[in-house]
Regions:
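Divalent metal-coordination and catalytic microenvironments
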Residues: 10, 25, 47, 58, ...
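N-terminal metal-binding scaffold of metallo-dependent hydrolase/deaminase domains
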Residues: 1-38, 48-50, 370
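Alpha-helical scaffold segments that flank or form the walls of functional sites
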Residues: 67-121, 127-142, 168-174
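Active-site core of metal-dependent hydrolases
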Residues: 153-163, 174-282, 293, 302
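His/Asp/Glu-enriched, well-ordered alpha-helical/loop segment
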Residues: 230-241, 285-367
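Active-site gating loops and adjacent loop-to-helix segments of metal-dependent hydrolytic enzymes
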Residues: 65-99, 206, 224-242, 260-263, ...
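C-terminal cap of metal-dependent C-N hydrolases
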Residues: 356-398
Length: 398
């Protein structure tokens, strides 16, 4: 059993200074003045901000190029989803990347940046089989004490158009995948009903959740949202389905959007948005006001799709705030809530937070306010996972 920890003089969400006692992985006391047990290790917060652990609810840790020579993007025109996928699959074969090595490198960088939870999609196709999945599962096993990870079995190259993929997805679920993924059921597989019926059937058989990539635009994407909601309701999977990206929600007229909002609320479907690209994306404030669960993430980091994303969730919040046109502190903090509490909810973590009894997943970071931390992106002073120090001054310790 680890010694207790006293985290002294920190400001939860920028509020009044206080101290926390961490014991057996939990927050056991919060008070301005705490007398630590004789065996406690004391960490001085120096009135810095205290945030709950950052939650990356949409990652692709299997495909980064971190630690390798710079990759100049080579995706050919017209740069559709299919073009990115084909280019990526070719380069992964040529570069002979170790998914375990690359995913472990990304996770350690994320831990240094205050990330305590990751939901990662992992490519499963008939070229690589389960190799990428197995590499990520190895990383999860090695770092499970330092980070909570969920794995989504993801048919990035298509499913129905590549015979054998469905069996591989189901095999991944049997081997421990937490979620089954999907991808653009009309534009990729060209059969939206069969695509969705297939992945929902796998989820229903094995009791896993669904997290579906939906890039399809306008009314085509909106139609897919309707089909997803229908199947969620029919199988009683309310609260167990996430739709990621969902650009269509920012492209349809108000009347249609209102109908979709009703379906999303009724079926407790989570929307994951990270504001990627330069086109429309979901109206996050409006969805939040309708009580639709929201989360965000990094997407792929430094990969064959593009060079820009980083492992830092505060950087993602900053970018998302820019894309939303947010300038007020309360607006930025709303996005930070999505990157913390929102992500923890979608990952089903009921022990998350900054209250007594919560697991001690904590980030100490300089800044007068949470918004300043988002804008300045300073190194994280301390990162704790279940009451264990896992990063200090921007350096991962595991």
């Amino acid at each position: 059993m680890a010694d207790p920890i006293l985290l002294r003089n920190v400001r939860p969400w920028g509020k009044a200074p206080t101290s926390l006692l961490l014991e057996d992985g939990l927050i056991t006391q919060i008070a301005a003045q705490l007398v630590p047990p004789p065996t406690a290790t004391i960490y001085e917060g120096q009135q810095q901000l205290l945030l709950p652990g950052l939650v990356n609810a949409h990652a692709h840790i299997d495909k980064n190029l971190l630690g390798r020579p710079w990759h100049a993007n080579q995706t050919p025109e017209p740069r559709r989803i299919r073009d990115y996928v084909d280019n990526e699959r070719r380069l992964r074969r040529e570069l002979e990347l170790s998914t375990h090595t690359q995913s472990a490198l990304e996770v350690r960088q994320a831990i240094a940046a205050g990330v305590t939870h990751i939901r990662t999609h992992v490519d499963i196709d008939t070229d690589a089989g389960l190799a990428h999945f197995e590499g990520v599962m190895q990383t999860r096993a090695e770092l499970n004490a330092a980070l909570t990870m969920q794995v989504v079995a993801f048919p990035q190259s298509g499913m129905l158009i590549r015979p054998g993929t469905v069996a591989l997805l189901e095999a991944a679920v049997k081997l421990g995948a937490d979620c089954i993924g999907g991808l653009d059921p009309s534009t990729v597989d060209r059969d939206p009903a069969k695509h969705l019926d297939t992945i929902f059937a796998i989820a229903d058989r094995h009791g896993v959740e669904l997290d579906i990539h939906l890039h399809e635009p306008g009314t085509l994407g909106a139609f897919a949202v309707e089909l997803i909601a229908e199947r969620t309701r029919a199988l009683g999977l309310q609260g167990r389905v996430t739709i990621s990206h969902v650009f269509c929600l920012g492209m349809i007229d108000d009347a249609y959007l209102n109908r979709l909002i009703e379906l999303l609320v009724e079926n407790r479907i989570t929307i994951m948005s990270l504001g990627s690209g330069n086109g429309p994306f979901p109206p996050l404030k409006r969805l939040h006001e309708a009580d639709i669960p929201l989360c965000t993430g990094t997407d792929g980091v430094r990969d064959t799709w593009g060079p820009y994303n980083s492992v830092d969730l505060l950087d993602r919040v900053k970018f998302l705030g820019y894309r939303c046109g947010f300038r007020k502190d309360e607006e930025v903090e709303f996005l930070l809530e999505i990157a913390t509490t929102g992500g923890a909810k979608v990952m089903g973590d009921n022990d998350y937070g900054l209250a007594v009894g919560c697991r001690a997943d904590l980030v100490v970071v300089p800044g007068d306010t949470p918004t300043q931390a988002v804008v300045d992106l300073p190194p994280r002073t301390f990162v704790f996972k279940a009451g264990r120090l896992v990063a200090e001054n921007g350096v991962c310790l595991v």
